[in-house]
């Protein structure tokens, strides 16, 4: 069960992330650079190529992975999320940006528990500023901002999401608050005999 302090800090980070990256000007920004090739001109996204071909074609949906023309970029999960976006919003960039903002906000919310887990901070009342500061730094770092702005950055956003979830999945005790315990006394106890 999450402690109230953990919930509050997570809410702060989620709100900050949504406020920073969810502004209308960012959500309605155009598709840029590689976004056009990955989304607008990708036959896997538009449905011109059958969806089961996502396992055979490169990220751009143009070449067989085994062909010499392919650059061997293979991101089927990302392509499937673009296809879902296309089914809901067509080529309107708003939906693609909104998904990236949601993914980034989820990642920001996962940073505080990841920091606590990484450093073994299990007491919910100690060091609350460090996980929040780490999450805000994560939210504002230019590498992550670029990944949110450009639709092709979804690959990085999904990678971060699955990494953070995987890390937390392997560190479950750090997510549960527990009472601070004292280490056992290493000195031998006196023998009553």
Per-region residue spans from a language model:
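Polytopic membrane enzymes that build or remodel cell-surface glycoconjugates and lipids
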Residues: 1-193
């Amino acid at each position: 069960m999450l402690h109230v302090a953990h919930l509050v800090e997570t809410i702060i980070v989620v709100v900050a992330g949504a406020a920073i990256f969810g502004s209308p000007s960012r959500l309605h920004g155009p598709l840029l650079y590689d976004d056009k090739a990955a989304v607008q001109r990708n036959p896997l996204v538009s449905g011109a190529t059958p969806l089961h071909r996502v396992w055979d074609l490169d990220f751009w949906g143009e070449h067989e992975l085994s062909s010499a023309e392919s650059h061997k970029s293979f991101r089927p999960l990302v392509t499937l999320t673009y296809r879902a976006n296309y089914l809901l919003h067509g080529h309107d960039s708003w939906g693609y940006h909104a998904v990236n903002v949601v993914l980034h906000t989820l990642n920001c919310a996962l940073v505080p528990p990841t920091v606590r887990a990484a450093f073994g901070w299990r007491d919910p009342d100690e060091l609350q500023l460090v996980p929040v500061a780490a999450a805000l730094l994560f939210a504002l770092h230019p590498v992550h901002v670029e990944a949110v702005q450009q639709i092709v950055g979804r690959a990085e956003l999904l990678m971060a999401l699955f990494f953070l979830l995987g890390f937390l999945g392997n560190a479950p005790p750090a997510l549960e608050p527990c009472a601070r315990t004292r280490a056992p006394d290493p000195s031998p106890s006196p023998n009553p005999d």
